[in-house]
């Protein structure tokens, strides 16, 4: 099965066919760095990092570009409030961005271009649009002539006539038409600006991504991605600008993730439920946040609350405990083997699980199903560990496959928070020990007791069941 991608442009799943065999050119819209990013921004960051990881796993060379918008109205306001320059604000929050997403185990982009460091390319694209008759100057501003681009609306599925009828935009006498959008803003007194053939000013938001994608990936790219809120107008405008400037298809596949809601409501400052990723990471394991984000298919809305995060924590712990138990068993292996036929049977099961995982990810990167398959792998690992004798080959294959699944999903299976176990991890091991004793696998039961003893946890077997205390 080839990788299938739901293409927003075509409104259906399509088999992925790269522009060049073995390569993927991918652009993801990055943040405007005037503050810490909110927790909803973390969803596309994690989702499309995982998409990239899977392409890499499948043997593709991925060039992954994600920009920083480091000048716009929000940055200018933040600079005034913080009594800093715009570059100082941008530097502060780009640093904060990397501090936060590094905790989420997000791989570094091939390039993270800043708008302000690529102004020549932006000005050149605007000049090209003017020369081709798609843009016009007006009192120091430059606007894109929307109606001249006949395919406008093809991504969002909106007709120009419908947009005209339903337009709710502030009247601007500088525009020839209310649907025209800004490519270049004339500088206001006291604002940061760049010199250009159109006068001093700075770029509009939409033109930035078009110019950066062209510079770093070329006229046509494989995949352009972002949150569903960017479909219109941002990505629609990007298509218009890029295709008008080059005469070529801008992107072959468009991917968009659904919103993250807080307790069922869309996050917004007006509702008072606006939460930054920075604050969430103060109280939560970033590994759990990543697991949570991947537990629902990226095109479905996802809800964040304490109960759901607790479920994610427990789900991740089950995987971590299975992994750590296998690793411990390998480290203490005494060379016992099962019959060869049984070994082959288990190895065949593992091959089937690997294929199931790939099928899940091939199906529009269905991480929710992939995690279900991951849990099935952990379940079978626990069953195998409960056997009196095991094959070191099978154990190593279990460990290797768990590492493989974790690498694709960007999850960490080692206990990164602390060397100790929390209560739920201890209880899971106690339950496994009870199962081993019921099956008269006393060697495994003693092994679990030893694992807990190493963590300074003492078990007490009573008539009411096994209790534990920390030594």
From Swiss-Prot:
EC number: 6.1.1.16
Motif ('HIGH' region): 31-41
Cofactor: Zn(2+)
Keywords: Aminoacyl-tRNA synthetase, ATP-binding, Cytoplasm, Ligase, Metal-binding, Nucleotide-binding, Protein biosynthesis, Zinc
Binding site for Zn(2+): 29, 209, 234, 238
Keyword set includes Ligase: yes
Catalyzed chemical reaction(s): tRNA(Cys) + L-cysteine + ATP = L-cysteinyl-tRNA(Cys) + AMP + diphosphate
Motif 'KMSKS' region in this chain: 266-270
Cellular component GO terms held in the UniProt record: cytoplasm; cytosol
Cited Gene3D superfamilies: Cysteine-tRNA ligase, C-terminal anti-codon recognition domain, HUPs
Co-factor binding comment: Binds 1 zinc ion per subunit.
Top-level enzyme category: ligase
Subcellular location: Cytoplasm
UniProt-annotated binding residues for ATP: 269
Domain of life of the source: Bacteria
BP terms from Gene Ontology: cysteinyl-tRNA aminoacylation
Alphabetical list of Pfam families matching this protein: DALR_2, tRNA-synt_1e
GO molecular function: ATP binding; cysteine-tRNA ligase activity; zinc ion binding
Subunit structure: Monomer.
Family listed: Belongs to the class-I aminoacyl-tRNA synthetase family.
Protein name as it appears in the record: Cysteine--tRNA ligase
Gene name for this UniProt entry: cysS
